[in-house]
Design a protein with these regions (language model features):
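N-terminal secretory signal peptides
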Residues: 1-24, 31, 36
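Cleavable N-terminal signal peptides
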Residues: 35, 46-47
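Short, glycine-/small- and polar/acidic-enriched structural segments
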Residues: 49-191, 198-204, 219-221, 229-230
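Short, solvent-exposed loop/beta-turn-alpha elements that line the ligand-binding surface or hinge
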Residues: 77-78, 224-229, 296-302
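Pocket-lining segment of extracytoplasmic ligand-binding domains
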Residues: 109-110, 186-278
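Secondary-structure end/capping motifs
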Residues: 244-322
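Conserved C-terminal helix/tail region of periplasmic/extracytoplasmic solute-binding proteins
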Residues: 315-353
């Protein structure tokens, strides 16, 4: 459905092509806003009649680990996840915005571009915290030394926000550097390891992989120095149709994510073993090393203002036209899950309360 919609315009942007400019990115977003009117993949179904299958997209970083564990360990009662494979990072959000999938773990920045374009979607929980990392080639040890250099990242991503804010903190801007956009996480990591970019902002475990593979490379920022601890990266978002028609399914998924967070906190090695290779295209050792650097945090109600503040960056970069408000969040199902599962919630290490 989505591919057919995109290909109606011979000059449009097919799923396999990643736009390299903001103009192309925004044209893709406009296309998706129209596709959203076609409806979602979710079909109403009584959970008592059998497991409800939700089509989903996900990212490639450790912020997605609880989402992966929900699927691999069958943690959601009455709900199963059907992951839809995407050819590029941009298409992870694209399919969600177009209504091809019901739910997604997505960078909050990508969510805001879809929301601004009119997609009927809501943030209902968090997924991962921290884990955005700026790494540089040997000899580059400060923001000032990035002047005139090439930084690799992804469009309208949290991985574009960090270098934007990192440079701003140093009195610089994107005008002082060359920004190069990539299509997939492995592609960006390999470009850095091969020395084809001077620096990159990447997600864990790919940042750790690159630092290990490129002798002498330097971590310039892990985001904590810019934003503080436990800043948001990815969020759990759902189509409004699903939220309205099967709230219990959304709650079951949120609870399962909390169970996954607890399991990950108790045994990171086991969580990595169940997800590396299939989801993380890095070595077991690099992934385990990185696991604690981007922990799961499902209750991110405390990050609402942080997320909204980043919207100004997206507007300045012309990804969105209007600043969103708190209405793009619906914490109701999360609040109910917490109230109904106080023992589980009390065992979580990272949370808002």
């Amino acid at each position: 459905m989505f591919r057919k919609f995109v290909q109606q315009d011979p000059d449009g942007y097919p799923l396999t092509e990643l736009g390299s400019t903001r103009r192309e990115f925004l044209m893709r977003g406009a296309c998706l806003a129209g596709a959203a009117a076609l409806g979602g993949a979710y079909l109403p179904q009584a959970m008592a009649a059998g497991p409800l299958t939700l089509k989903a997209t996900h990212g490639t970083g450790l912020c997605n680990c609880p989402f992966f564990l929900v699927k691999e360990r069958n943690l959601a009662q009455g709900v199963t996840l059907d992951f839809v494979t995407t050819p590029s990072n941009a298409d992870i959000a694209a399919l969600f915005g177009a209504g091809v999938v019901d739910v997604s773990v997505v960078p909050y920045t990508n969510f805001m571009t879809l929301y601004d374009a009119g997609a009927p979607i809501k943030i209902v929980a968090g997924s991962g915290a921290q884990g955005c990392v700026i790494v540089a080639q040997p000899g580059i040890t400060s923001a000032a030394q990035l002047r005139g250099k090439t930084i690799g990242t992804f469009q309208a991503d949290t991985l574009e926000m960090l270098p934007y804010d990192y440079l701003k903190k140093a009195g610089m801007s994107f005008a002082d550097v060359k920004v190069r956009y990539f299509g997939t996480s492995p592609e960006l990591a390999q470009a850095f390891i091969a020395g084809n970019v001077d620096a990159m902002c990447h997600i864990e475990p790919y940042a750790t992989q690159a630092l290990k593979a490129r002798p002498g490379s330097v971590q310039l920022s892990n985001g904590v120095d810019v934003y503080g601890a436990n800043y948001s990266d990815c969020v759990l978002a759902v189509r409004s149709k699903l939220l309205h028609e099967n709230r219990d399914a959304v709650k079951a998924l949120i609870k399962a994510m909390m169970v996954a967070q607890h399991q990950e906190e108790l045994d990171r090695a086991s969580a990595v073993k169940d997800t590396v290779g299939k989801y993380f295209k890095t070595s077991y050792d690099a992934t385990l090393d990185a696991a604690s650097k981007q922990p799961a945090m499902i209750d991110q109600r405390s990050n609402q203002n942080f997320i909204l503040q980043r919207a100004q960056n997206l507007k300045d970069l012309r990804y969105i036209k209007r600043l969103p408000g708190p209405e793009m969040f619906d914490w109701g199902p999360l609040n109910e899950v917490i109230k109904e599962n106080s023992d589980l919630y009390g065992q979580l290490k990272l949370k808002s309360a």
